[in-house]
Design a protein with these regions (language model features):
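The feature encodes the CheY-like receiver
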Residues: 22, 65-66, 83, 95
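C-terminal output helix
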Residues: 115-124
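Short, glycine/charged-rich "phosphate-handling" switch motifs in NTP-dependent
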Residues: 108
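Residue-level signal for the "D+5" position in two-component response regulator receiver
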Residues: 38, 66-67, 104
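Acidic, metal-coordinating helix/loop segments flanking the phosphotransfer/catalytic sites
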Residues: 38-57
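Charged docking surfaces used in two-component/phosphorelay signaling
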Residues: 23-31
Length: 138
């Protein structure tokens, strides 16, 4: 089955300009039996989201070329077809104000870099589980 025909519940968007980080995050998500669509920068993620809204979750880097993660979150939260997708913001910045800005923009979760694979696995499980809780509450 090709990745563009996968059911909504099995796909996660990963947007990060660091190829090593994209690979690490993608590998961990795939280990949890999800499929991954990657974007190498904010503009690429924006284009993907314009044409495809069938994602279980999105994991976005805060600082990316062409379009910052916060701007991408704001876009997602204004689009009806995207607003319910849980979003995890990741960043190497250790500023509490950035975390607050992420949540204010609409992020569901925040994970500071560096993180261990176990921390990422746990954060992804919580992010994806949060989606199920929202469906029950809706």
């Amino acid at each position: 089955m090709s990745s563009d025909k996968l059911p909504e519940s099995k796909r996660v968007l990963v947007a990060d300009d660091d190829p090593v980080m994209r690979h690490l995050i993608s590998t961990i998500i795939k280990q949890q039996k999800y499929d991954v669509v990657v974007a190498e920068d904010g503009r690429a993620a924006f284009r993907i989201l314009q044409s495809d809204s069938a994602f279980k979750a999105a994991i976005l880097d805060m600082t990316m070329p062409f379009l910052e993660g916060l701007d991408l979150i704001r876009y997602m939260r204004t689009e009806k077809r995207l607003m319910r997708i849980p979003i995890m913001m990741i960043t190497a910045e250790q500023d509490i104000k950035l975390m607050a800005s992420s949540f204010a923009a609409g992020a569901t979760a925040f994970l500071p870099k560096p993180f261990t694979p176990a921390q990422l696995q746990s954060a992804i499980r919580m992010l994806l589980g949060n989606r199920q809780l929202r469906k029950i509450a809706a």
